[in-house]
Amino acid sequence: MPYHLSESHKKLISSHLSESDPEVDAIIKDEIDRQKHSIVLIASENLTSTAVFDALGTPMCNKYSEGYPGARYYGGNQHIDRMELLCQRRALEAFHVTPDRWGVNVQSLSGSPANLQVYQALMKPHERLMGLHLPDGGHLSHGYQTETRKISAVSTYFESFPYRVDPETGIIDYDTLEKNAVLYRPKILVAGTSAYCRLIDYKRMREIADKVGAYLMVDMAHISGLVAAGVIPSPFEYADIVTTTTHKSLRGPRGAMIFFRRGVRSVHPKTGEEVMYDLEGPINFSVFPGHQGGPHNHTISALATALKQATTPEFREYQELVLKNAKVLETEFKKLNYRLVSDGTDSHMVLVSLREKGVDGARVEHVCEKINIALNKNSIPGDKSALVPGGVRIGAPAMTTRGMGEEDFARIVGYINRAVEIARSIQQSLPKEANRLKDFKAKVEDGTDEIAQLAQEIYSWTEEYPLPV
C-alpha cells in the first residue's frame, strides 16, 4: 500500500517527544525534576500513579464522542462507551453507593465547571444558593463575591449569600447558617470547602436544607479520596448531589464527577404520593450539550484506573497515613506556638495563621519556594486581601504518596518554621518607604547563605523518595 505523504511527514507523527520537540521535552523534564526535589504541600495537589499516566497518554484522546453511552452523535464509539460505563460503575463502587439510588456523570472537565453545571441544571438565572464564605474556607465556585464586585461568574448568573465560621472557634456557625437560610430560602445549599480543616456536619446541613426546601449539594473535591477509603464520614447518606474533582486526594487525572440521587425524594405528608428525584436528565443535559461538547476520553480512561486503585487496601493504608501526617502538622506547629484556624484538623491539611508571627502568607510562600517547598498562601477568617493573606495552607497528600511518614512531616514543620523566620527577618530589614511585596521579593532574590543551604538540603533529602512518572 502506498503512503501518500512524505517520509518526513511519517517521521513527524511517529517520532517521540524528545526527538520531535526538544524544547517542550526539556520543560517537562525540568518540571519532573522540580517535583522530585521539592516538598510539595499544596493541599489540592497530589502525585498520580504510573498506571494513570499510562491511560492518559493513549489514542483514547483521538476519539470524539458527543453524547452518552448508547446515544452518541458520532460513529465508532463502541469502545468509548465501554470505557465510560466502566468508569461510571467503578465510581459508584469506589464510594460505596448503588446504581438504584445514585447515578454519576464522569464527563465534566474540572471541578468548577462541574459545580456550574449543577447550578444551571437546577436553577434559573438569579435563583439563590448559599456556600461557605471564601475567606472562611469556601471555594470560588460556590458563588464568591465581595461588597463591591462579583468575583466568581457563579455570582453573576445566580444570587449567592455566604455562610461563615464562628470567628472564635473557626468552626462553621450552623445556627446562624440556619437562621439565614430560613430568611434567604436558597434553592441549593452547598456543603463544601477548599481551606476548611474540620469535618462538615452533613446531618445538620441536611436538616437545614429540608427546612427551607433546598437541594443539599456536597462538593467533596478535597476529601473524596478520604471518603472513598472510608477514613472519614461519607456525605452520600445525606446529600442530593455530590461533586468532586478527581486529582486531589483521590489521586487520579485532572477531571471531575457529578453524582446525583435517583429514586424517591420525598413522600407527600397528606396524600402519601411519592415525589421522585429529577436530577439525572437535567444534570446530564447541563454537562452536554449545555456546557461541553465531546468529553476527554483519555481522562475518563485514566479516571477508571484511579477509581479501581481507590478500592484497594493499599489506598486505604495511604489515606490513613495522610490523616496521621496531617495530625503531625497540627501537633508540631502548636509546639512552635503557631495558631491553627479551627485549632487543628480532621482532614488532610492544616491552615496556619501567620498574623501572630508578624508576617503574611505571600511572603512565606515566596521564601518556601526558594528553599524547594511548595505551599500556598491562603485567606483566613477576617482577611481583606486574597493576594496578601494572613495564612498558609499545608496539605499532606502529595508527600504521603511519595512515602513520607510522621517523622518526616515533623521535619517539614521545622523547615517551614525556618522559612517564616527568614521571611520575618527580611521584611523587618526593609525601609518603610520600600517594604511592599515586590520589595520583599527583590530582597529575597539577592539570596542568603541560609536560603541556599536549606534549598540544597531539601533538594538532596527529597531525592530519596520515589516519584511516580
UniProtKB/Swiss-Prot annotation:
Subcellular location: Cytoplasm
HAMAP family for this protein: SHMT (MF_00051)
Organism: Eremothecium gossypii (strain ATCC 10895 / CBS 109.51 / FGSC 9923 / NRRL Y-1056) (Yeast)
UniProt GO MF annotations: glycine hydroxymethyltransferase activity; pyridoxal phosphate binding
Catalytic activity from the UniProt record: (6R)-5,10-methylene-5,6,7,8-tetrahydrofolate + glycine + H2O = (6S)-5,6,7,8-tetrahydrofolate + L-serine
Disulfide feature: none
Modification sites for N6-(pyridoxal phosphate)lysine: 248
Domain of life of the native organism: Eukaryota
Keywords: Cytoplasm, One-carbon metabolism, Pyridoxal phosphate, Transferase
Swiss-Prot/TrEMBL cofactor(s): pyridoxal 5'-phosphate
Record protein name field: Serine hydroxymethyltransferase, cytosolic
Gene: SHM2
UniProt-listed GO biological process terms: glycine biosynthetic process from serine; tetrahydrofolate interconversion; tetrahydrofolate metabolic process
Reported function: Interconversion of serine and glycine.
Entry EC number(s): 2.1.2.1
Keyword Membrane among record annotations: no
